[in-house]
Curated annotation (Swiss-Prot):
Keywords: ATP synthesis, ATP-binding, Cell inner membrane, Cell membrane, CF(1), Hydrogen ion transport, Ion transport, Membrane, Nucleotide-binding, Translocase, Transport. This is ATP synthase subunit alpha. It is a peripheral membrane protein. The record marks 373 as: Required for activity. SUPFAM superfamilies: C-terminal domain of alpha and beta subunits of F1 ATP synthase (SSF47917), N-terminal domain of alpha and beta subunits of F1 ATP synthase (SSF50615), P-loop containing nucleoside triphosphate hydrolases (SSF52540).
Length: 513
């Protein structure tokens, strides 16, 4: 075969013309130390605070300490095979998690990867875990309720859409049970739920997921998990990841509810990271920015106005407000609410529900202490019927507590005092409620009406629970339409008052409890 020199030169020219030098600029550094999930990297001059650093083996770390000649970063995942001298790169990206409706009904880890063994995740994009909270002008006042299904909470400590209400108490006082029942109660309300489990046992979380599924609430819920066996970095970031998933619904004119269970464990994880990064410790060895840790998270829970939603969706959604309601949980030690983290979160939130171990052990469940529990903005969100009928409950309980303490020392009590004590005991008994049995607005209203109008005074204390159960069965059977009407409108007028009175008069006459 004979080669033509002209052809060869043309071929070479063609190849030269086609040759394209692709240059890739990236900021590269070297690991100088690895210990306890923390790496120190030399040479990353242009790294950002919170930036993802690419590590060998398709892993990454997050830059938290930017020092003069090195960067302190926390590894997201296993770090046993990392060694000094390994090369790492800047990615130019902040940590993002998948968001969207495809996450509903799924159990995911902090990074948004599914861990429930089901089909691959479908999502509508990614959202940064750290986001700036909506400004004052973009917000709207809280005036719509979130019904927890608990009589004691919805009557005395009402929660509104866009509110932050702290659930605080010692271990084993029913904090998680209250939050999970609030999720179960949203299954028909249209409110999307996010449950963030931080530092809990995997078996406990599996039980929660099973209960949500049994009660038909999992399809409406995203469960974000950072178990006790996972790294402190994943436990620290889990609430922010869950919040980003909740903001997806808020920014599109929908309502969402997020539970952080619990922020005490997140603060401990952050303290661990900060001490390993050699940051100076402060009170209780927490770093100086532990208040900011929780404030920047909880400020993202808000109710945004229709203009914000319209601008965010570029006009696709009009005339709708969005909300993200937060129920953070804090665990106290022996009822000490003056510790560092509890006082911080109390000052950030719009109210708190105190659960007490002595009430829990006395069989009063939910173990809410109405004297020191408060909702600062939820009162404006209560439905008309609940506002009208719940007013006397808090007063009755306050008077009962005062008189109960006094009556221990008094030998003879007048009739008025004895009547008040009896009424207080009946109301306390009436507010008891079993787990996984949330009540509708109409059911709560009927029970509160019975308490306020004296229908319980001649019912034995031990029979109050039976009275309530029989009453619920009776109205479901005889007055389903009225109950449906109250649930839909939340209104209270002379007609509804007369109907409730008629129901209770007829039911009392049957003596069927």
């Amino acid at each position: 075969m004979q080669l033509n020199s002209t052809e060869i030169s043309e071929l070479i020219k063609q190849r030269i013309a086609q040759f394209n030098v692709v240059s890739e600029a990236h900021n590269e550094g070297t690991i100088v130390s690895v210990s306890d999930g923390i790496i120190r990297v030399h040479g990353l001059a242009e790294v950002m605070q919170g930036e993802m650093i690419a590590l060998p083996g398709n892993r990454f770390a997050i830059a938290l300490n930017l020092e003069r000649d090195s960067v302190g970063a926390v590894v997201m995942g296993p770090y046993a095979d990392l060694a000094e001298g390994m090369k790492v790169k800047c990615t130019g990206r902040i940590l993002e998690v998948p968001v969207g409706r495809g996450l509903l009904g799924r159990v995911v880890n902090t990074l948004g990867a599914p861990i429930d063994g089901k089909v691959p995740l479908e999502h509508d994009g990614f959202s940064a875990v750290e986001a700036i909270a909506p400004g004052v002008i973009e917000r709207q006042s809280v005036d719509e309720p979130v019904q927890t299904g608990y009589k004691s909470v919805d009557a005395m400590i009402p929660i509104g859409r866009g509110q932050r209400e702290l659930i605080i108490g010692d271990r084993q006082t029913g904090k998680s049970a209250l939050a999970i029942d609030a999720i179960i109660n949203q299954r028909d309300s249209g409110i999307k739920c996010i449950y963030v489990a931080i530092g809990q046992k995997a078996s406990t979380i599996a039980n929660v997921v099973r209960k949500l599924e049994e009660h038909g609430a999992l399809a409406n819920t995203i469960v974000v998990v950072a178990t006790a066996s996972e790294s402190a970095a994943l436990q620290y970031l889990a609430p922010y990841a869950g919040c980003a998933m909740g903001e997806y619904f808020r920014d599109r004119g929908e309502d969402a509810l997020i539970i952080y269970d619990d922020l005490s464990k997140q603060a401990v994880a952050y303290r661990q990271i900060s001490l390993l990064l050699r940051r100076p410790p402060g009170r209780e060895a927490y770093p100086g920015d532990v208040f900011y840790l929780h404030s920047r998270l909880l400020e993202r829970a808000s109710r945004v106005n229709a203009e914000y939603v319209e601008n965010y969706t570029k006009g696709e959604v009009k005339g709708k407000t969005g909300s993200l309601t937060a129920l953070p949980i804090i665990e106290t030690q022996a009822g000490d609410v003056s510790a560092f983290v509890p006082t911080n979160v109390i000052s950030i939130t719009d109210g708190q529900i105190f659960l007490e171990s002595n009430l829990f052990n006395a069989g009063i469940r939910p173990a809410v202490n109405p004297g020191i529990s408060v909702s600062r903005v939820g009162g404006a969100a209560q439905t008309k019927i609940m506002k009208k009928l719940s007013g006397g409950i808090r007063t009755a309980l306050a008077q009962y507590r005062e008189l109960a303490a006094f009556s221990q020392f008094a030998s003879d009590l007048d009739d008025a005092t004895r009547k008040q004590l009896n009424h207080g005991q009946k109301v306390t008994e009436l507010l008891k409620q079993k787990q996984y049995a949330p009540m509708s607005v109409a059911q709560q209203a009927l029970v509160l009406f019975a308490a306020e109008r004296g229908y319980l005074e001649d019912v034995e204390l031990a029979k109050i629970g039976d009275f309530e159960a029989a009453l619920m069965a009776y109205v479901d059977r005889e007055q389903g339409e009225l109950m449906q009407q109250i649930n839909q409108t939340g209104a209270y007028n002379d007609y509804i008052e007369g109907k409730l009175k008629g129901i209770l008069d007829t039911f009392k006459a049957t003596q069927s409890w």
